[in-house]
Design a protein with these regions (language model features):
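Short glycine-rich anion-binding loops that position phosphate/pyrophosphate groups of nucleotides
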Residues: 32-35, 86-87, 112, 157-161, ...
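Phosphate-binding glycine-rich loop
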Residues: 63-104
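Active-site phosphate-binding strand-loop segment of PLP-dependent enzymes
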Residues: 133-192
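N-terminal "arm"/small-domain region of PLP-dependent enzymes with the aminotransferase-like
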Residues: 1-56
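Short, structured coil segments at secondary-structure junctions
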Residues: 76, 122-123, 178, 203
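Conserved active-site segment immediately N-terminal to the catalytic lysine
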Residues: 196-203
């Protein structure tokens, strides 16, 4: 069977998920899981959708959902992408936005371990920047990057697995310092202790 794999697969490093205890009841914040069940109205909506609609394709543009999300965050519907979980959205971002011949994607050396997996999968050159001794992202390191060599920057906020967050002022300073570099803020854990940068989109 191995003879059918594409040659580049040999160079890929598999994603290694965080520790997942199999016994006992834990609140797994590292997996972004909630200890609470969905609201009763949500459960009822899921049941209603499952009754007679599962055999149909959903509306391709997810217009109604995008309208609601856009209204909640104060942005435009065309600025909302709906996917099957954040990993799918990340995969599209890596393939569509970060892949530029002769330029690198930059992220912290201690960060979400799926980043190098996607970079390898899509053939994206990478450069990592060390976090500080207290596990912080030094925004000055990113402000000093050369846009002729770097296409894009990505980091979680708060960072994973360190949980240390950047302030909006720091993120805004980076955006102003690097107008020619795409900056992606991965906010998978933003509700645990950081301010969303979505409001900066309109600036």
């Amino acid at each position: 069977m191995n003879k059918f794999w594409s040659p580049f697969v040999d160079s890929l490093e598999p994603y290694v998920p965080g520790e997942q205890p199999r016994e006992g009841e834990f609140i797994k914040l590292n997996s972004n899981e909630s200890p609470f069940s969905a609201a009763p109205a949500v459960i009822e909506a899921i049941k209603a959708a499952a009754d007679g609609a599962l055999q149909l394709y959903p509306e391709a543009e997810s217009s109604e959902l995008r309208d609601v999300v856009a209204d909640y965050y104060g942005i435009k519907p065309e600025q909302v992408f709906v996917g099957n979980g954040s990993d799918e959205a990340l995969g599209h971002a890596f393939n569509a936005l970060f892949k530029h011949e002769g330029k690198k994607l930059v992220y912290p050396d201690l960060s979400y371990s799926f980043y190098p997996v996607y970079a390898g999968l899509y053939g994206i050159e990478i450069e990592t920047i060390p976090v500080t001794e207290d596990f912080r992202i030094n925004i000055d390191d990113y402000c000093a990057l050369d846009s002729t060599e770097i296409s894009s920057i990505i980091f979680p906020n708060p960072n994973a697995p360190t949980s240390v967050a950047l302030t909006l002022d720091e993120i805004e300073r980076l955006l102003k310092a690097q107008p020619d570099i795409l900056v992606a803020i991965d906010e998978a854990y933003v509700d645990f202790g950081a301010d969303t940068a979505i409001k900066l989109i309109q600036d």
